[in-house]
């Protein structure tokens, strides 16, 4: 028995090492070995099975090619082809290392159809080996030195892979270009190529045919390509490109791309139809999805508006115009471009006047610049251009330096945001005319503002004198009010803690459990409502910071006479928030009503509102994922208290990021209950003819039909959740193809790319599991049907539990946040009213209190 056990052990070890050696050898071919096509053909496989190299036939073709493709996924996209111009007609191909040390591909007649074509520096080529790596690189090297002799990365076809080095030599003009396939099923060299232009500042160029430019990326500034304005938004597209510096011994520099997440499978490809795409593998959908493509619009087409013309994407079509100081050469024919109206001083040979510069902002800089890297001062750059009569424009870009344009300005494009500033050289009369017009407009506006300001100041002083004259306790005869001056002592305050009735425009409001402040006390606390104490303005009116005599900091919301909100909202806050006590709801300390003054007094929030941090690029990093998730949980608990656990069942109806305040410890506090409604114990839904809320946060049934319920708040919470995770406003994408943040989130969710929605500032450090769960929950909350949305108890459970099962959400269709589209679609009778606040115009709560 012992003999058999030993024999079995030895046999197992032998088989293990044999299989191990076989698997290790599966990615290499040594001298004397070969890879053969045919029925029993087995491709070479990289160590982690990421890539394979072997023979294939594209589509329905019978031609055979040697290529590299992805190995461990269903869609085995081909990324490199050896014999793309010389296919083999049958399955007789053989890959081997020849006697001269070259890697060769032979057909059935032993004819070389492809070779690595290198000159051997040694007579002993027996130590050469070729292997496929997990990067997709096919490398011929020597076993004793492991030095690459030849590699496929230096001879690309149509695909740029991560870690591939794209060589460009500004001195010799050499560059490695990626050439498209001829068709979808024909790998032979096509009509389009993509590469780095070796002249000027490095930029990626897409050529058609014999080097006719079709698209370019704009100059590389060591961080982004300046002609791709959304590059800073596409984080995974941006953070990975690098340009080696300084040049190597041959004068070459190299572009590389290393993604922030190495586990993501991605590739850049130039297609046979003349577009460049970045494709990513979607494991959920089991397919490649397009992440970005160029050219992406009409204005991206190279030099669409001709020389000295500029293209602007207004609406869906690109609109051409001449830059200021130029006129069309041939009206209606933009291919001929524009020409200068007034010659420059040096062209007229006169000594009177001086050429000036007109600045164009947020533009794609023209092509064919002359870099002056040693000039980094704006004045030096300007002077360099002025001294050269051929200079038409200059620009100073961080990471590049000064750039001069001595030729025609071509391929100009106007962006909504991003881009660079270009200084156009014009005759003094052209700039002077433009400057005079601007000065006239500015002077007119300033005079108007000053006159309005003087009038407003006089009116305010008159009104303040009138108000303060009767602003002490019990002296106002127009109202029936009992007021306590709470700045004196706690004893005085407690004496008025019982039920106090005040009359507001003939309507009795019971302030049970809510102290009432005198106007005098608040005026002292806020230093007579001085401008320095103003924290902000909302739909209600201005909000002031104050300090009571006992040292407590307060925030005073003062109802403005021109407020979009009025007495009903004022009453609502008094009635509702005074009865609510929860750590995630803002605390109302009291109110004041004297004469025409109506004020609410809150606890002061030193960290202002959530949007103060969330939408400010300089402050986004201060709220990391741990803090954001804590804020999300706090808001959810506050809503659950309102919907289920408070003495009153309350629907907020205006939940948004600016109505979430942050205390000293960054705990979230839901605020602004002016639009809230009380629900009965068994009431599930109500209808209103007075639709209130904020565009982008209103649920479909509420905005369209006036129906509201606790599920209306759930919808708003879903939008808020997407904003917190992404760091984007819900209205920030309304001009994009997705129409809204909800539409963009749904697109990423269905394509298995939800992690791309996460704020780039926290994407690397956040809990991916929690972030994806938050996005999934948000998608459930913003479903069109209120019945299909979860309640807040379920939402909180899904957020806090790793084991909770999350249902598949239905596609939301009500995703547009455009004001005009919502107005058009309101299907309500003429008696219905709309009270709508907007994050872009005003906020119903201040930035801080």
UniProtKB/Swiss-Prot annotation:
Q: Native species of this protein?
A: Arabidopsis thaliana
The residue ranges crossing the membrane are 439-459
- Give all residue intervals belonging to the Protein kinase domain: 529-814
Claim: ATP-binding is one of the keywords in the record: yes
Q: Name one GO biological process term.
A: recognition of pollen
Q: What is its EC number?
A: 2.7.11.1
Which residues are connected by disulfide bridges in this protein?
Answer: 299-311, 305-320, 381-402, 385-391
What does it catalyze? Answer: L-seryl-[protein] + ATP = O-phospho-L-seryl-[protein] + ADP + H(+); L-threonyl-[protein] + ATP = O-phospho-L-threonyl-[protein] + ADP + H(+)
Q: Which positions carry the signal peptide feature in this UniProt record?
A: 1-25
Chain positions with Phosphothreonine modification: 688, 844
Q: Where is this region: CaM-binding?
A: 618-635
The protein's recorded glycosylation sites are: 110, 191, 210, 230, 273, 282, 333, 349, 388
User: Which SUPFAM superfamilies does its entry note?
Assistant: alpha-D-mannose-specific plant lectins (SSF51110), Protein kinase-like (PK-like) (SSF56112)
- What protein is this chain from? G-type lectin S-receptor-like serine/threonine-protein kinase B120
- Give me the Extracellular side stretches, as residue ranges: 26-438
Annotated PAN domain ranges read 346-427
Annotated Gene Ontology cellular component terms? plasma membrane
Annotated residues for binding of ATP: 535-543, 557
Family membership noted in the UniProt record: Belongs to the protein kinase superfamily. Ser/Thr protein kinase family.
Gene name linked to the record: B120
The membrane topology noted for this protein in its Swiss-Prot or TrEMBL record is: Single-pass type I membrane protein
UniProt domain EGF-like: residue ranges: 295-332
What are the GO MF terms of this UniProt record?
ATP binding; calmodulin binding; carbohydrate binding; protein serine kinase activity; protein serine/threonine kinase activity; ubiquitin protein ligase binding
Using the record's annotation, list all stretches that form the Bulb-type lectin domain. Answer: 26-153
Recorded hits in InterPro entries, A to Z, give: Bulb-type_lectin_dom, Bulb-type_lectin_dom_sf, Kinase-like_dom_sf, Pan_app, Prot_kinase_dom, S_locus_glycoprot_dom, Ser-Thr/Tyr_kinase_cat_dom, Ser/Thr_kinase_AS
